[in-house]
């Protein structure tokens, strides 16, 4: 099996201000993941508290990656918005760093949305 990121990889959380994003990001910090912040459109400039630490929130992935030099993103957004979040992350990593790892565990993403998102990522 290939190793896609190192143990100290800088990770962003898309949807960090939502219920699932907060829950999972908190557990990730507790278990030692190097969270560097999050992205939620319209909530840039805010911070979230995870494990008694403050993490910044940006409006866009491009802003977040530029500010943090993140290596990966994990996506915790509702199914109707997940494919768009994947494509935004792909664009941002491509334009800022040239590469990055995108993880999305959202259940119930419409099949056609995922087909479009996967094609978008692979055809870059």
Regions found by a protein language model. Name each.
Residues 27-51:
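NAD(P)-binding Rossmann-fold cofactor-contacting core
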Residues 56-61:
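Short acidic-hydrophobic, aromatic-tinged amphipathic segments that line or gate anion-handling sites
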Residues 11-13:
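Conserved hydrophobic helix-helix packing surfaces used for dimerization/oligomerization
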Residues 1-8:
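A short, basic/flexible loop-to-alpha-helix module at the beginning of a structural domain
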Residues 66-72, 76, 80-112:
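Rossmann-fold NAD(P) dinucleotide-binding segment
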Residues 20:
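Hydrophobic/small residue at the entry helix of a nucleotide-binding pocket
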Residues 17:
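N-terminal Rossmann NAD(P)H-binding glycine-rich loop of SDR-like oxidoreductase domains
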Residues 107-124:
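Rossmann-fold NAD(P)-binding glycine/threonine-rich loop
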């Amino acid at each position: 099996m290939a190793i896609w990121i190192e143990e100290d990889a800088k990770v962003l959380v898309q949807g960090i201000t939502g219920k699932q994003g907060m829950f999972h990001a908190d557990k990730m910090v507790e278990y030692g993941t190097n969270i560097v912040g999050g992205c939620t459109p319209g909530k840039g400039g805010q911070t979230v508290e995870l494990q008694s630490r403050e993490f910044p929130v940006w409006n866009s992935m491009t802003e977040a990656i530029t500010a943090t030099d993140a290596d990966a993103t994990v996506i915790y957004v509702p199914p109707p918005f997940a494919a768009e979040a994947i494509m935004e992350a792909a664009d941002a990593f491509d334009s800022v760093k040239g590469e990055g790892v995108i993880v999305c565990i959202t259940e119930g993403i419409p099949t056609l949305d995922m087909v479009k998102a996967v094609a978008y990522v692979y055809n870059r």
